[in-house]
Amino acid sequence: MTANLTHLQRLEAESIHIMRGVAANFSKPVMLYSIGKDSSVLLHLAMKAFYPAKPPFPFLHVDTTWKFREMIEFRDRMAAELGFDLLVHINEEGVRDGINPFDHGSNVHTHIMKTVALRQALDKYGFDAAFGGARRDEEKSRAKERVFSFRTASHTWDPKNQRPEMWKIYNTRVAQGESIRVFPLSNWTELDIWQYILQEGIPIVPLYFAKKRPVVNRGGMTIMVDDDRMKLLPGETVEERMVRFRTLGCYPLTGAIDSCAATLEDIVSEMLTARTSERQGRLIDRDEAGSMEKKKREGYF
């Protein structure tokens, strides 16, 4: 029967199978919802997997308070339209300390407002499994991570101590306090994601489409000026350029690309000739050598 499935149908079936397995084997799962294209695909798959019922788990957004405004508007609109259970967690201690990407740098900001905040939320609600939208084609540390990725009671990850997943048989056993991060999109590529979004008509944040936007050039990256908190460096000037984003995060740490791709068809065509990873647009991946693996070891998404 599977021989008659298309490539995207096979990926969809695998992801839905993983989601249903987690729902059946864990007492308190959660889906991490970062609002980007991969999260939009995860949300769509979750709605499909348990239809006509709603997904039997909440969706958690870790809000750094520095996301693009259009991302937050999109998040709230989707939650209202689809009626899923949305949890929003902010590291209030980090807010009180004034942690921000300008004064503290991307490394400190990401650790406190994302990694620590995520660990806080997982502990607060007692989740034993957390879905994430990471894909193996994104980055080398994600390439070697299992679909079911074991985490200690302190949410740390040891890449040298991973469980085998031969024949797509997943080990779901965890002791008290331990948890699993689950990545249903592990075997998808960026092109797969866009072709699936086009095929299924999945709503996405408008920032993915090319449009004239106010930007500055900083450190070889094109940064969008999203609000009045943007601190310009000496000599920097804001200019209007036709840009879009391949990846979304905190706006001061996310680079845009020059593009005229204003439709899903345009984006798919652009992806067919792309020769770089979307992660090149994320400043947090440039902090230091092995930056992403270090973050993941500490409990990052």
From Swiss-Prot:
Catalytic activity from the UniProt record: sulfate + ATP + H(+) = adenosine 5'-phosphosulfate + diphosphate
Disordered: annotated span: 282-301
Pfam families: PAPS_reduct
Gene3D superfamilies on file: HUPs
Top class in the EC scheme: transferase
E.C. numbers: 2.7.7.4
Keyword Membrane: no
Alphabetical UniProt keywords: ATP-binding, Nucleotide-binding, Nucleotidyltransferase, Transferase
Source species, domain of life: Bacteria
GO biological process, one term: hydrogen sulfide biosynthetic process
Pathway annotation from the record: Sulfur metabolism; hydrogen sulfide biosynthesis; sulfite from sulfate: step 1/3
GO molecular function: ATP binding; sulfate adenylyltransferase (ATP) activity
Function: With CysN forms the ATP sulfurylase (ATPS) that catalyzes the adenylation of sulfate producing adenosine 5'-phosphosulfate (APS) and diphosphate, the first enzymatic step in sulfur assimilation pathway. APS synthesis involves the formation of a high-energy phosphoric-sulfuric acid anhydride bond driven by GTP hydrolysis by CysN coupled to ATP hydrolysis by CysD.
HAMAP family the record matches: Sulf_adenylyltr_sub2
Family indicated by similarity: Belongs to the PAPS reductase family. CysD subfamily.
Subunit structure: Heterodimer composed of CysD, the smaller subunit, and CysN.
Protein name per Swiss-Prot or TrEMBL: Sulfate adenylyltransferase subunit 2
Gene field: cysD
